[in-house]
A protein has these predicted regions:
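Short inter-helical turns and helix N-cap capping residues of alpha-solenoid HEAT/ARM repeat scaffolds
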Residues: 15-16, 46-47, 81-82, 113-114, ...
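Amphipathic alpha-helical scaffolding segments comprising HEAT/armadillo-like alpha-solenoid repeats
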Residues: 1-11, 30-44, 63-79, 98-111, ...
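Long, ordered, amphipathic alpha-helical scaffolds
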Residues: 174-222
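Non-membrane alpha-helical segments in proteins
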Residues: 18-26, 40-41, 48-60, 87-92
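Histidine/lysine/aspartate-rich catalytic loop segments that bind and position anionic ligands
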Residues: 111-155
């Protein structure tokens, strides 16, 4: 069957949430301008899964419409009732590198107890590359949730602030090998003599994946 704006709109207007999901998945096969207009009403759909999928698509369909994407995504981040949708909004804001959204991301981070939302925000801060995110990432390093802590380690590397090196060094002894692995990647990005020393230490790590990644970073950044 040929996919047309009319056929997709029919799916999006269906009372069946399965049809609406199908319509959302077909939007990427349409002209971006048309698809973006058709996408927007679905972010307030009655069905959580439909809203989640709709919000997630802003990462790709919203590239040419950043102002509108910012408006819609911040609204969903702050006011959607479902943590999954809030997290998807944070992911999309990061993917679109909408640094202007930082105050909204910080507000949501501090006003939620949902780990998934906090995790998505911390991951997004690395993609945003906004220096205002440094203090929040520093705070997240002390999270009791290992996934949030690991995301903070990664995002500090992406942010590129050399002050992060001193904060990250203690994680060379973290019992979770995945934290040490992410640490290596971040130290590789941050560079500097202290980073090289830690990478040399981790090149002898008992976990092969960690040791190999450290050796690779030493070669790339020597």
């Amino acid at each position: 069957m040929t996919i047309t704006p009319e056929s997709v709109q029919q799916l999006l207007n269906s009372e069946s949430f399965g049809d609406r999901l199908s319509g959302l998945n077909k939007l990427r096969q349409l002209d971006v301008k048309i698809a973006f207009e058709m996408l927007q009403p679905l972010v307030t759909d009655i069905n959580t899964r439909v809203r989640y999928v709709a919000v997630s698509q802003f990462d790709t369909l919203g590239q040419q419409y950043l102002d509108k994407s910012l408006e819609v995504l911040c609204d969903r981040l702050l006011y959607d009732a479902e943590p999954d949708v809030q997290a998807a909004a944070a992911d999309a804001l990061g993917g679109l590198k909408l640094a202007v959204a930082f105050p909204h991301l910080e507000t949501r981070y501090r006003n939620t107890t949902e780990w998934l939302v906090q995790f998505s925000i911390i991951a997004a801060l690395g993609e945003l590359g906004d220096p205002r995110g440094f203090d929040l990432l520093k705070e997240a390093l002390s999270s009791d949730n290992p996934l949030i802590k690991t995301a903070a380690v990664s995002s500090l590397g992406e942010l590129g602030d050399p002050r992060a090196v001193a904060l990250l060094i203690p994680f060379a002894d973290d019992p979770d090998w995945q934290v040490r692995y992410r640490l290596i990647q971040s130290l590789g990005r941050l560079g500097g003599e202290e980073s090289q020393e830690i990478l040399a230490k981790l090149a002898q790590d008992e976990v092969e994946q960690v040791a190999q990644e450290a050796k690779l970073q030493l070669i790339v950044h020597r």
